[in-house]
Design a protein with these regions (language model features):
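Catalytic core of DAGKc-family lipid kinases
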Residues: 20-22, 29-31, 71-185
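ATP/nucleoside-binding phosphotransfer catalytic cores, i.e., glycine-rich phosphate-binding loops
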Residues: 8, 175-176, 181, 206, ...
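Short Gly/Thr/Asp-enriched flexible loops that form oxyanion-binding sites at enzyme active sites
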Residues: 61-73
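Short, well-ordered alpha-helical microsegments
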Residues: 37-38, 62-63, 272
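Glycine-rich phosphate/pyrophosphate-binding beta-alpha loops
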Residues: 128, 132, 188-202, 269
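Gly/Ser/Thr-rich active-site loops/lids in small-molecule metabolic enzymes
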Residues: 143-153, 203-224
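N-terminal glycine-rich "phosphate-gripper" loop used for MgATP/nucleotide binding
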Residues: 55-60
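ATP/NTP phosphate-donor binding region
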Residues: 1-53, 293-301
Length: 301
């Protein structure tokens, strides 16, 4: 309930009371620390009883609940957005607004969704490694500053990473059976379409088609990267030079480096020198408002 700037505990209890009016047994469980939502979710789904989990927070809270519930047929998950980042729900288009009220969710349809497995952690939307992940990590580090707004934190994070740190890193990238060793600015595996506040690197990505799109961007100068980033962010990768950017549909991607690789999973960052990304097909039961589409507005394949 503290994922955003304002405590939403009272609102959550009010929605729970309305769910009980539909004859549902409902519990409000509050987290006290990072990782708490995953532990609670795992404990509930391990009982074997049918359970519906409402993750009240942002993308990070939802990611924790998903990691606790993924792979359990008796469990379904949804999200009530009260956090500072809710890129996942953008995949539902105009129906995203309906997720703010549990009244729209309690009898909602279940959608089996694919996930990305990253070193054993599950990711809903996009797993990115490189400069964009480092920016995301810096945003979190700067977010508690009393002198910076949310937008100010983002701009400061971009400045720190672009001006004072190198963009690229030397990686060995394996795409199924193909091996590439080069300097990369970023590698992003896309199950969904949105991350980083609304960037859509692969607009045709769908969360239930058994296909993952991986974007590889070679290391280039700061000036060139700044020039192409808007096109990358808007999903116009086909308009960019093929020697700089490439999109593949490998099911298994591995990134290896002698230095730490920062990887961002649904807004949460991890460090590793060996990043393994694979498809977890139909791993999550997700429910939303009646008639909603998790691939609303997705471009043609």
């Amino acid at each position: 309930p503290h994922a955003g700037k304002k405590d939403q505990t009272g609102r959550i209890y009010e929605m729970a009371d309305r769910l009980r009016q539909h004859g549902l047994t409902c519990q409000c469980l509050l987290t006290q620390r990072s990782g708490g939502a995953e532990e609670i979710a795992r404990r509930l789904v391990s009982s074997g009883e049918e359970v519906r989990l409402y993750a009240c927070g942002g993308d990070g809270t939802l990611n924790e609940v998903v990691n606790g519930a993924a792979g359990f047929d008796n469990a379904a998950v949804t999200c009530i957005p009260i956090g500072t980042g809710n890129d996942f729900l953008k995949n539902f288009g105009p129906d995203a607004a309906k997720f703010t009220d549990a009244e729209n969710l309690w009898d909602g349809e279940v959608h089996p969704l694919d996930l990305i497995d990253c070193n054993g952690r599950q990711c809903l939307t996009i797993a990115c490694s490189g400069i964009d992940a480092r920016v995301a990590e810096s945003v979190h580090e700067l977010g508690d500053s009393p002198f910076l707004s949310g937008r100010g934190s983002y701009l400061a994070a971009v400045a720190v990473n672009f001006l004072f740190r190198g963009i690229g890193q030397h990686w060995r990238v394996t795409l199924d059976d193909e091996v590439i060793e080069d300097d990369f600015a970023l590698v992003s595996m896309c199950n969904g379409r949105y991350y980083g506040g609304g960037s859509t690197p692969v607009p045709e990505a769908r969360m239930d088609d058994g296909v993952l799109h991986t974007v590889l961007v070679k290391n280039i100068s700061r000036v060139k990267f700044a020039g192409l980033f808007s096109a990358y962010s808007a999903g116009r990768y086909r308009s960019l030079p093929p020697e700089v950017i490439r999109v593949v549909t490998a099911k298994n991607v591995r990134i290896q480096s002698e230095d730490d690789i920062v990887t961002c999973l649904d807004g949460e960052t991890i460090h590793s020198r060996d990043v393994r990304l694979t498809l977890s097909e139909k791993r999550l039961n997700f429910f939303g408002p009646k008639g909603c589409d998790p691939n609303y507005g997705a471009g043609p394949k």
